[in-house]
Amino acid sequence: VSVLLDQLPLLPEVGFPLPMPRDRRLVALCTALLNEPDSPETIREWCTRLGMSERTLARLFQRQTGESFGRWRQRIRLHHARAQLEAGESVTAVALNCGYASVSAFIAAFKKLFGRTPGQLAR
């Protein structure tokens, strides 16, 4: 965890507002996800790694960021997806890379966050 905290100043700037927690364990989690947004690790795996229960993680994350861990993680993934789409990747490839089970679920989540579909972004 201390190694991850040392890496914070080296992180690239995030081009969107993103609430960050203060708890060192949650900072380590968020840092790892910022570096690898499409990480397949589940919340249970993160909790085991961080030595906390799922309920504790959920409660702390909500209190310190104002949103749920799942919502925060989805925002990271969708912003990463947007960058991939802007680089010319196909909607299908990006949806699968971001861990969505279906392209339609990805499109719905993308539209909810950005107000337009991935296809509209490409135009």
Language-model features, listed with the residues they occupy:
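Pre-recognition alpha-helix immediately N-terminal to the DNA-recognition helix
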Residues: 24-32, 73, 77-80
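Basic, amphipathic alpha-helical hairpins
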Residues: 7-14, 29-42, 61, 65, ...
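Short, basic interhelical loop/turn and adjoining N-cap
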Residues: 49-56, 99-105
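Terminal helix-turn-helix DNA-binding modules in bacterial transcription factors
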Residues: 40, 44, 63-103, 107, ...
